[in-house]
Amino acid sequence: MYENSVEIMSGDSFQIAVFETLFLLVSILAAALLLGGRVRWIWLVPIPVVAFLGKLILFFGAHGTLGNWIGGNYNWEGKIYSTAFTLTLIILLFGRDLKQVGLTLSQKGIAPRLGIAITSVTLIATIVWNALYFPGVKSEPIIDMLYQGSMPSLDEELWFRGLLLAMLVKGFTTNGVIRKDHYGIFLAAVVVTFQFWAAHSITTNGDWGFIFRTWYNPVAGIYGALWITIRLATGSLILPIILHTVANIVGYFV
């Protein structure tokens, strides 16, 4: 989603990272209970650790720990290192079958036509919503426009609807076989969607006070639900990445 350039204090950042990780942990445990505990913990246990490390990398970049060799008002360095971290894990865990994380140009998921139809509607709705809700063309330096047109969509799609979804599906399905009612995959999609919303809504009062700003960015939850539906329907991250990018940059044009 679109990112602002407001700097967050390092203490607040660490607290937010902890809160987001705990939120994810609780979501995973709740889903495991709904599945009667018939899950593969070997895939689920590492997820909160990976999520926490990825968030720390992101915040290190925001505070200049990773350098400031690109410039601009946004966290290029944190996003680049975070993306590299996610890609490394994808290669290590799913390198033999990248389709499991949606890294394929092929649009041959469980319902590709439905996915493409939802993509078309979502694209139009995104443009119309931005034109009505954020009237006037926004202007920023080219380096910032390039950031919004690349890093958030790549980093977040590779993590949320790529690696995280794939690990959850592995954990929520037994022996690598999808349940006949697809319940495990549905729960994985729900966890990813709520976590995506949480990542854009969780904050702190600065003294370990948990705050979930339910109506601060509800569109993140809506986008998250639509994009993961498209990801599952097409079997690919391509269209979610494109839609995510459009959502971030459409304000520069309409």
Set out the residue ranges of the language-model regions.
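Intrinsically disordered, low-complexity regions enriched in Ser/Pro/Gly/Gln/His and often acidic
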Residues: L34-G36, T122, A220
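N-terminal capping/interface segment
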Residues: A84-K108, I116-I124
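Residue-level recognition of transmembrane alpha-helices
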Residues: G115-I116, H244
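Transmembrane helix-loop-helix hairpins at the membrane interface
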Residues: S5-M9, S13-I28, I124-V254
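Alpha-helical membrane-spanning segments of integral membrane proteins, especially the hydrophobic core
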Residues: A111-G115, Q148
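N-terminal, membrane-interfacial amphipathic/helix-forming hydrophobic leader that caps
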Residues: M1-D97, I249-V254
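Membrane-interface helix-boundary motifs at transmembrane edges
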Residues: A32-V45, L98-G109, T173-H182
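Hydrophobic alpha-helical transmembrane segments of polytopic
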Residues: I47-A51, I118-T119, V192
